[in-house]
């Protein structure tokens, strides 16, 4: 069954917008601007529902896995004026922790292989939905 009418218009707008976002993202990344990952969505039906998917998209566009991870952690802390307080694993810092099966700094897909989650020092039961 195909799309028609408004659904088809939304589909085309969504894909044109994604191409534009990808081009702009690469331009920003190349200039060295501070990149941030977030959960704000332009389209309600966006496939980027999870931050891990957004980070994978950043890597697919050419960012290193480590720089993509920084966009969701330390960069956010710095922009909020909270560097050293959040967004890092360091003595005295508040930390939520995601334990994954693999090395996400080498392969961003490891972020989807969640082994444990800690929030404010407490282990959360899995699976998280």
Model regions and ranges:
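His/Asp/Glu-enriched, well-ordered alpha-helical/loop segment
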Residues: 2-11, 17-100
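C-terminal cap of metal-dependent C-N hydrolases
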Residues: 72-74, 78, 91-129
């Amino acid at each position: 069954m195909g799309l028609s009418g408004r659904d088809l218009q939304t589909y085309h707008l969504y894909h044109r917008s994604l191409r534009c976002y990808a081009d702009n993202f690469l331009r920003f990344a190349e200039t060295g601007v501070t990149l941030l990952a977030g959960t704000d969505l332009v389209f309600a039906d966006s496939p980027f529902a999870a931050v891990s998917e957004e980070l994978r998209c950043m890597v697919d566009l050419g960012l290193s896995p480590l720089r993509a991870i920084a966009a969701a952690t330390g960069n956010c802390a710095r922009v909020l004026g909270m560097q050293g307080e959040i967004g890092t694993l360091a003595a005295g810092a508040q930390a939520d922790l995601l334990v994954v099966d693999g090395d996400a700094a080498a392969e961003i897909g490891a972020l989807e292989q969640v082994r444990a989650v800690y929030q404010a020092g407490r282990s959360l039961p899995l699976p998280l939905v």
